[in-house]
Amino acid sequence: MESKYKEILLLTGLDNITDEELDRFKFFLSDEFNIATGKLHTANRIQVATLMIQNAGAVSAVMKTIRIFQKLNYMLLAKRLQEEKEKVDKQYKSVTKPKPLSQAEMSPAASAAIRNDVAKQRAAPKVSPHVKPEQKQMVAQQESIREGFQKRCLPVMVLKAKKPFTFETQEGKQEMFHATVATEKEFFFVKVFNTLLKDKFIPKRIIIIARYYRHSGFLEVNSASRVLDAESDQKVNVPLNIIRKAGETPKINTLQTQPLGTIVNGLFVVQKVTEKKKNILFDLSDNTGKMEVLGVRNEDTMKCKEGDKVRLTFFTLSKNGEKLQLTSGVHSTIKVIKAKKKT
């Protein structure tokens, strides 16, 4: 499947820009890919694609190319490349998509097996502090988790879970809910597409997630996933700084330094509301800067006025021309919090 990503990187991406546009594209590669400028100076399109893939892998190379195209305002090309990537993503999912759980897999014995796997993971030998830096780096690379379907069990602490809501798909209406979980090292936003699991996602509860998808910035739990209560002796000691970071609203000047595609949750003050035919545009601000939000126009968002606050969940950092923008997606939610009336 990686060959498909290589193909669209070259044929849909780099082959469709002019020599002058390629030079501008190369300007950003040394930072995005950590490629020496000397190697890029005389490189043709095939050589550029090869360097990118060697440095970051085919999938990451495509995603970063989309971001650079957006940064350069090659919006049509960015859109085409994104569409082709999504087609390949769907093909990959259809190949790797796990089958629904059988009765045997849902049995207590299967649950016990998952817990045994977790116990083995916890008992795995750790890297000695006396290991050389080069060896530590190799171990870290071996242990790094790739995006996609994950069989490995993940013990986490639930930090937050929101109410289920309905969203539209080509197959009709479906239900899901958002959650936030954390390990001892990091936190994750989670899309949960099985609302029967809502009683598992209780704040401060330790659970084990298996057969889930890992994406850039979030986890996906669906009907084929397993979510179990951890054993009473299983602990996930989440540091306070991770808990705090998971729940805080990012500052706008921080968002302006993040890569396109970053998932954003938070509470923001509205400075201006502009209604469009199908969408609604909010100008947000905090004490560090300003940013636009493009949301779906509905009864709730149309009630929003200057001075109100909006709580955004699963919005995506994107670009509209030269402006950074937070954009609503199929699984995004927005809640309007009216400002208190002055007495």
From Swiss-Prot:
Changing residue 335 to A: Impairs DNA binding. Impairs DNA binding. Keywords: Cytoplasm, DNA damage, DNA-binding, Immunity, Inflammasome, Inflammatory response, Innate immunity, Nucleus, Tumor suppressor. It is found in: Cytoplasm; Inflammasome; Nucleus. One of its GO terms (cellular component) is site of double-strand break. The keyword Membrane does not apply. Residues 1-87 form the Pyrin domain. Changing residue 36 to R/D: Impaired homooligomerization. GO terms for molecular function: cysteine-type endopeptidase activator activity; double-stranded DNA binding; identical protein binding; pattern recognition receptor activity; signaling adaptor activity. SMART domains: PYRIN. Changing residue 244 to A: Impairs DNA binding. Impairs DNA binding. Pfam families: HIN (PF02760), PYRIN (PF02758). GO terms for biological process: activation of innate immune response; AIM2 inflammasome complex assembly; brain development; cellular response to interferon-beta; cellular response to xenobiotic stimulus; defense response to virus; DNA damage response; immune response. InterPro entries: DAPIN (IPR004020), DEATH-like_dom_sf (IPR011029), HIN-200 (IPR040205), HIN200/IF120x (IPR004021), NA-bd_OB-fold (IPR012340). Changing residue 162 to A: Impairs DNA binding. Impairs DNA binding. Expressed in spleen, small intestine, peripheral blood leukocytes, and testis. Changing residue 309 to A: Impairs DNA binding. Impairs DNA binding. PROSITE patterns: DAPIN, HIN_200. The pyrin domain mediates homotypic interaction with PYCARD/ASC. Belongs to the HIN-200 family. This is Interferon-inducible protein AIM2. It comes from Homo sapiens. The lineage of its organism: Eukaryota, Metazoa, Chordata, Craniata, Vertebrata.
